[in-house]
Amino acid sequence: MTPLFLFKINLMKSRFILFIPAVICFAVTFYLLTIPGNHLPKIEWVGKFQVDKLIHISMFFTLCFLFSYPVKNWIDKYNWLLYITISGILYGIAMEFVQKYFIPLRSFEINDMIADSIGCGINYWWWRRKYDQVKSA
């Protein structure tokens, strides 16, 4: 094996390692979104103030942020940021259908999809702003 080949393998491993927090976050969000409704804690004031929407926004922002971070130095980072954002939005929509049809005592809420999309959109805005600041400097 040539040293260049080994360098490429090490580079690929190091790129993969950067995605480990994102994969863990994905697994946690999947778990949280698929908990049956009767296992969710009943907190009276959460429903009153729509705190669950803030949880959705922060959860999907974090998920997209952790997938966006490793690509920040890639040449085609703008394209990857768009792919990650669209994938996050589609994941949020898909999980609402999963909750509706496959998870007992969970409901389908369009407002949850909107909150998920807002979280992904905030991540997109944050990274685009950061990329454009570096570009103009």
What is each residue range found by the language model?
Residues P21-L33, L81-Y101:
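Small-polar-interrupted transmembrane alpha-helices in polytopic inner-membrane proteins
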Residues P41-E44, I93-I118:
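Interfacial helix-loop-helix junctions of multi-pass membrane proteins
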Residues I9-F16, V71-N79, Q133-V134:
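Membrane-interface helix-boundary motifs at transmembrane edges
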Residues L82, R106-Q133:
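Functional transmembrane or membrane-interface alpha-helices that line membrane-embedded catalytic
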